[in-house]
Amino acid sequence: MRAFQVVEFASPIVPRDIPDPQPRASDVLVEVASCGLCHTDVHLQQGYISLGGDRKLPVSMTGLHTPATLGHEIFGHIMAFGPSSGLTAADVGRPVIVYPWIGCGHCAACLADRDNECPMPQSLGWQRPGGHGERVLVRDAKFLIDAEGLNSDAGIYACCGLTGYAALNKIVRRDGPIGIIGVGGVGLMALSIAKAMSLGPIVAMDIDAAKLMLARQSYGAELSFDTRSGNVGEQIQQATGGLIGVVDFVGAQQTVDLAVSVLRTGGTYVNVGLFGGALQTPLAILAQRQLVLRGSYVGTPAELRELVALARGGRLRAIPIQNEPMDSINEGLTRLRAGKVTGRIVHTHRQVTATQG
């Protein structure tokens, strides 16, 4: 099969012919139709995650080694399976979304269906080959979400959607305005999900005027603010009286400082972004204002199933999708790295076209 692989960090991804994976035991082989492109792919391809300043975490320390097949927003069809998978011939060809955040299968987190908290992750597109290959091996059928009736862009729910849904679930209070920092693909999806969950009013924050306009006019954000404004925190406080929750999809120094400054007493800050910020709020302030600080990393298999149910029920507004061939993966990474993508890029493998449900 053909796979698009990182052979050398910070260099273009290369198409290579590699052996087809063979399912054994409980394995399921999925033929990949499409795979969404994520900022995590940008970090992994460059070879490090920024920790702020000059500090960097090499991705080799997280279990990714070259040659690596990235891609974790996977939509495909069941192709083959191992003898203890629990599947039958009737399942072959069934459309599925793949939950990629697979754990070791043995620790307390995995046994409690919280694979995303596993200390020894085996995530597809990271520690294990992902959807930038034409076929992907999934350890167990429980990580396959039925996608009947959904179109082939639905793989984005496995990260772009799940990341926002799980982060919103971590906000403690639900009785006031909620801020979303960064309204790119994940932020717009989170906005759509927040509306489906009857949260809000929603305050959108970004540095891109076009994205803010889209968030307000098409996705229901009641207010929007350009975070480059020198007094944006004061503007938000005056307009809302403070926010009960902020989800930060950027994670830069400026965004964490802004988020903490606009929270009400008892508010929740949820950080998702990986752009190198550091928390510098005095501990006395945390205590006096009774703030809740949470990190959020994707979500559980159960949360993905809940999210897909929302989508199937027609309660989510689709985000802008740019369907492109997998051969253009490097161009997509360049645009995403430069912040030139509104919504999501979804790459399709050769001889595979987007299917409508």
Model-predicted segments: where are they?
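Glycine- and other small-residue-rich loops at beta-strand/loop junctions that grip anionic moieties
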Residues: 99, 157, 180-183, 204-205, ...
